[in-house]
From Swiss-Prot:
It comes from the Eukaryota. GO terms for molecular function: nucleic acid binding. InterPro entries: Ankyrin_rpt, Ankyrin_rpt-contain_sf, G_patch_dom, GPANK1. The keyword Repeat applies. It comes from Drosophila melanogaster. This is G patch domain and ankyrin repeat-containing protein 1 homolog. Signal peptide: none annotated.
């Protein structure tokens, strides 16, 4: 600045900047100390400590008239309630496999009736026999609790107890021996079960003389189980896990009609035909014979004799070679 009346060239920016101004405090008397404010106690007029103590004692001694607000157990019961188990439909092969594998949790999730629990395979074995033979103690205990028949035997006359003793599973033997068995009523129960008629849904017949356990292992029942395959490709041993089969089913194939989008394709393979030797055009040929022989066709087992060919010696081969040389020489002479 040249003079006191002139302003700073950047006076506008200095006036608009948000500067914090310093405030100066004048010095005071050093001997003077300000008194700190004391905490003021709130006092209630007309009430002393003894009266207040007596009042609180009366309040505490008075009986309560309202019930305390306890947490409701209904809500906790709803929160702790386990979700309902979804039962899986009964599958005989899966039921036997789970019993031998000692998987009790999966067994309990399967919907099985009393007949399903006592079902047998083609050898007359029940799930209890299989579990006892494999030493599946938990599965045996679960089946016994469900009320399976312990004294049933297979076609060879072996019970679950005998199979466990033969395999050396002492835990299973002790479990089966500790069960209370009524020997007197066993014969009566067998006679009653044998006389009860039943209807087999697989065989579509009513049975009166044969009991249900024996009918399960009969040849007629086992044959009818395999009479109706799941689909037509079952006879070709194509598994349901086959990727090609899964793709066709996913695209809408019903596993019954022909192949292709229009379901008009050939389902079964083309029959093979024996190849015939073709001698030339215009010559009649025999009808092609299908390689699949019919029933009671003796040609299927007929032994065909091989064509006889005479044995050639070295002299015969030399003689044939000379004959061919003479024939070639004669043709050259004629053509020249």
């Amino acid at each position: 600045m040249n003079s006191q009346n002139e302003l700073h060239p950047n006076w506008l920016a200095l006036t608009t900047l948000p500067l914090q101004l310093k405030r100066f405090v004048r010095a005071g008397d050093p001997d003077f100390i300000a008194e700190s404010p004391k905490a003021v106690k709130h006092q209630i007029d007309g009430l002393n400590g003894a009266e207040a103590r007596e009042f609180y004692k009366e309040v505490l001694d008075a009986p309560t008239t309202c019930q305390p607000n306890l947490p409701s157990t209904h809500k906790t019961a709803q929160t702790r309630r386990e979700p309902e188990r979804i039962l899986v439909p009964f599958d005989k092969s899966k039921f036997f496999r789970l019993a031998t594998s000692n998987k009790v949790e999966e067994l309990s999730q399967m919907k099985a009736s009393e007949e399903d629990l006592n079902s047998r395979d083609s050898f007359g074995w029940t799930a209890l026999m299989m579990a006892a033979c494999e030493g599946a103690t938990e599965a045996v205990s679960w089946l016994v609790q469900r009320g399976v028949q312990v004294e049933t035997s297979d076609k060879s006359g072996n019970t679950a107890l005998k199979l466990a003793q033969r395999k050396g599973h002492l835990d299973v033997v002790h479990l089966l021996e500790s069960l209370p068995i009524l020997e007197e009523t066993s014969e009566e129960d067998e006679s009653v079960d044998g006389n009860n008629p039943f209807y087999c849904e697989i065989c579509k017949r009513d049975y009166k003389e044969t009991p249900w356990p024996i009918h399960q292992t009969s040849t007629v029942h086992q044959f009818n189980l395999k009479a109706l395959p799941a689909h037509k490709l079952h006879k070709f041993n194509i598994s349901a896990k086959n990727r090609g089969l899964q793709l066709m089913v996913k695209q809408g194939w019903d596993q019954e009609h022909g192949l292709g989008p229009s379901q008009s394709g050939r389902l079964y393979p083309v029959k093979t035909v024996l190849r015939k030797q073709r001698t030339g055009l215009g010559i009649e040929q025999q009808s092609a014979r299908v390689s699949h022989f019919g029933a009671f066709d003796l040609n299927a087992v007929r032994r065909r004799d091989p064509i006889y060919q005479p044995r050639r010696t070295r002299s015969d081969m030399q003689r044939e070679k000379v004959r061919e040389w003479k024939r070639e020489r004669y043709l050259r002479r004629v053509l020249s």
